[in-house]
């Protein structure tokens, strides 16, 4: 059953929330040591939450619209009384003293927090190999990376260790692992979801979002976490839609979708074959297909990383070892140190105008071109990641690693929503279809993904 069917089953007393938690705990007990997905699991707390929900249902009391659904949370999102390490030695003794806004919203709707998932150290990576706790295995492609930086969250869903997981997406960190693990991942419009309680990698790019095995889980999670937050300055005012309303859609009649030639050109041929078949399903469902060009694709990666380096350097200055943990430069991994050192260099007064300000100008060009493209179409569709996940332990240069991000950083630079859903497989390895829309058209992506699932 899909996530919303399970929710209905719990609310209709066909299964209990406690049974749901126990089923996931059993899988974690059997597989987590091998897969290294959850860094911390609080079985007692999760079972206690579940029993309270079951009691309310038995007594005919009102329950939330996530009642009994189980969540895994990325290790850079604050959850009270859990170790929130961002998978770094720097924070290995930092206990969350409060809940991030998204956690409070999940709990308010009777969602159950089961534990904390692995990730790339400080979200700086695309493979979940840089974690100080060791790499996470890909349940859908054994021996290969799950993607990153939210690799533990994607793997938790793929391994059926939770119903829904939360991740953060700076340049594809939800969509990249969703593609590699064959699950659904969603990066909302920038500002649609509060970032209060997130350990930032890059303030102007980061966004919290959900991962699940089907679109109904994404829609339910968005209904809970997408809202204005007066404590977080980047959240947007305005009423959010009911994302579950799109799950009833059966057709894409009247929707125009665009394929970008440049996205195809940078993607491996066998991935394009799988993605093209998926796009054809959208056309069969009634969508009109057009081809567009994106002139600024070569600007995207250098622009993204220049901004990322500077904002990451600024964000990590608070990890100086005085209040908790260690000084970050003394204990961090190679990729985190690289970003700090480059960010420090670019941030110097004599270089800021030469690099950072030009990156901001390039970002404006990218945003303007994407938004102009989306004025004439409803959605942009194409590959999520241009190449297959490498084998764990393979040595890649930094530029080879960054190449995973070329198609996903665009949404972060432009602030637009984007989702990834399994398009198919190449030699048994999942590949994703990425769907992007203009700002605040998140619902259109949910609709397209739901119709695609029904077509399959």
UniProtKB/Swiss-Prot annotation:
A Pfam match: Amidase
Taxonomic superkingdom: Archaea
Keywords, alphabetical: ATP-binding, Ligase, Nucleotide-binding, Protein biosynthesis
Enzyme class: ligase
InterPro entries xref list: Amidase (IPR000120), Amidase_CS (IPR020556), Amidase_dom (IPR023631), AS_sf (IPR036928), GatA (IPR004412)
Gene3D superfamilies attached to this UniProt entry: Amidase signature (AS) domain
Similarity section: Belongs to the amidase family. GatA subfamily.
Cross-referenced NCBIfam families: gatA
Protein name stated in the entry: Glutamyl-tRNA(Gln) amidotransferase subunit A
